[in-house]
Amino acid sequence: MKITVISPHRGDAAFALGLSIRAWLEEGHAVEVVSCFTRSEFAPYSDVGSVHKNDRVSFVTAVRKREDEAWRKQAGTAKFTITDLNLKDAPLRLHVGASEVFGRAAEASEKVVAKIKRALEMSKAGAWVLPLGLGGHVDHVTARDVALSARPGEGFPVAFYEELPEGIGVAADEPVQAAVVSLTLAVQSKLEPVFAAGVEDVEGAVAKKRRVAWCYDSQIDEAATLEIAEACRKFEGRERIWANEGWRGAGL
């Protein structure tokens, strides 16, 4: 089966699902990550500060594209692909500051809707994995809601991943449950926690997850890579996703 993952920005799917995607590939599935809002000026750990303001979008967009490519090469299989929709991220699209992108309702222009829906249609996937929307980032909520509106039917296999680092720690438990309850109503199916991989050597899982996170070193520092990698300890070296009945029935 082909599984398509919606990643609002480059790195979101990698941080949350690096181990799961590896497990799906090892089980023989094809995986496509659709990176949506990829035109950006946000790369705090790059040299963007030395670039003229008129060139920052092209500079950052190119840097982050190389990071997606690094992850794809690390996976080492033709069954793993990454599709770039080249949409502007929220600060560029909505003309707001970086601190103003949270807690906003989904805001999707006709272009955004058309590109995301078209990508999902062209993927011809048998299952989708979408962000929960933890933290309320408008790009995450928008990508998720547009994808949900494009579902082929209520029984279509769909699952939701917990974004990182938003989903880390006890403080995240309540937002996770709130998102699950809300999305249960949206998909008209009970969402239950599932894991793509079986229990494995936890230290090995942490190391694998950290290697994936480090592909995106313009976005995060060493402390963040550790935080993201260590998150899988909570689930015995795995990543939790929330799946509808269609997903569970497909045995994914």
Q: What is the role of each PLM region?
A:
Residues 1-113, 117-118, 122, 149-156:
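Active-site rim/loop-helix segments in enzyme catalytic domains that contact anionic ligands
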Residues 3, 54, 102, 129, ...:
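Residues at structural and domain junctions
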Residues 6, 10, 61, 109, ...:
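Aromatic-acidic/polar surface patches that form glycan- and anion
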Residues 11, 68, 128, 139, ...:
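Divalent metal-coordination and catalytic microenvironments
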Residues 12-13, 40, 135-138, 168:
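Active-site environment of divalent metal-dependent phosphoester hydrolases
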Residues 14-16, 144, 167:
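Hydrophobic positions within alpha-helical membrane elements
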Residues 27, 66-85, 92, 96-100, ...:
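The feature marks non-catalytic terminal segments
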Residues 112-120, 125-153, 158-164:
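Hydrophobic, aromatic-enriched interface-forming segments
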